[in-house]
Design a protein with these regions (language model features):
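Acidic, low-complexity intrinsically disordered regions
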Residues: 1-335
Length: 335
């Protein structure tokens, strides 16, 4: 996803929200002994066929509201991974019509809006020249969340012209950012939506049967995230390839519960069927594991609990934030 020769040295610091509460140094503890999970949650299947079935299952699971976090991939490969699926244009090209990233955000937003009662959505970018594979940047200079998906889309359009696509690609920083937010919320249930254009970076120097540092860090982050009430949905846009994403979905060992769902946005949206039907199929595929994942966090006793060993992550400001408009500061608090 990112450039082959990208290098970066973004330092790790602590996460600070706009109300000046510092998400900084925290004591590191060994993970608490884990309860034995019902086998049906160790590998959660794709269970539903209609959006109504998913919505009903969410309600039956007791999920009345969730907190959303959005992560957007700004690696350089977005310039060419739309060669087949997006008529050769950059997947981040901004014009009169929505690009694949905007389409995915809009459809998920329409579906999950009813479950995000405070309408505050922390949004982050990764893989650009400021973050590479070591960090994330917030959509707002003071790290406050976006106010609904319309604000997400608006800020996305303002940010895209100001940044430089780069790499390499790792999902570890955005997953660690999400774990920090979950921990500081007191263990509230969150859904992390990552929209990305392909694989985690795998160098030509990585031998057969070995993992690149980006692959290893991503897998470790997914495993650690399963100790938190956090579901991860990775939406793939562009041409792929997607084989490693499917491995992440099905075959990562040692997780407390199956916390990761991969959805091939391009495959669904390229079908020759009614647009509304495609949008529904995409939403169903993205959300179908959420009811069982939420039930797993209840059974494991990790919902509503601080784990005490999440990363302490701070986002950078958005690229060229002096150019971006900055409305009056909106404080948001963890309840």
């Amino acid at each position: 996803m990112g450039g082959k020769n990208s290098r970066e040295t973004t330092p790790d610091t602590s996460y600070q929200r706009s109300n000046s509460v510092t998400y900084a140094a925290r004591h590191q503890h060994a993970p608490a002994p884990q309860r034995r999970l019902d086998r049906r949650y160790s590998r959660i299947g794709d269970n539903y066929e209609t959006l109504e079935q998913v919505t009903s299952a969410l309600a039956q699971a007791g999920l009345e509201s969730s907190n959303l976090i959005v992560g957007i991939d700004f690696t350089k490969s977005n310039e060419w991974t739309g060669m087949r699926s997006y008529n050769g244009r950059s997947l981040h090209s901004v014009g009169a019509l929505q690009n694949p990233y905007e389409q995915a955000i809009s459809i998920i937003g329409q579906t999950l809006a009813a479950f995000d009662e405070d309408n505050l959505i922390p949004c982050f970018g990764f893989g650009d020249a400021s973050t590479h594979d070591h960090g994330v940047f917030s959509f707002y200079p003071d790290s406050r969340p976006c106010q609904g998906f319309e604000d997400v889309l608006s800020r996305y359009r303002e940010i895209v012209p100001q940044l430089k696509l780069s790499g390499p690609t790792s999902f570890a920083p955005i997953i660690e950012m999400a774990m920090t937010i979950v921990e500081e919320s007191g263990g509230q249930y969150h859904v992390l939506l990552i929209i990305a254009d392909g694989q985690v970076t795998r160098s030509v120097d990585t031998g057969s049967g070995q993992l690149s540092s980006q692959e290893r860090n991503t897998i470790e982050a997914i495993v650690k995230a399963s100790n938190h009430p956090l579901s991860i949905i990775l939406v793939g846009v562009g041409d792929g390839p997607w084989d490693l994403m499917k491995e992440f979905d099905d075959n990562i060992p040692a997780r407390t519960f199956d916390n990761f769902q991969f959805v091939n946005f391009t495959d669904i949206m390229s079908k020759n069927v009614d647009p509304l039907r495609k949008q529904t199929e995409f939403a169903v595929n993205a959300l179908m594991e959420i009811p069982s994942q939420y039930q797993a966090t209840l059974q494991l006793g990790i919902l509503g609990a601080r784990r005490g060993y999440s990363p302490a992550t701070v986002p950078l400001p958005p690229p060229s934030n002096d150019i971006l408009r900055s409305p009056s500061v909106h404080q948001y608090h963890v309840n």
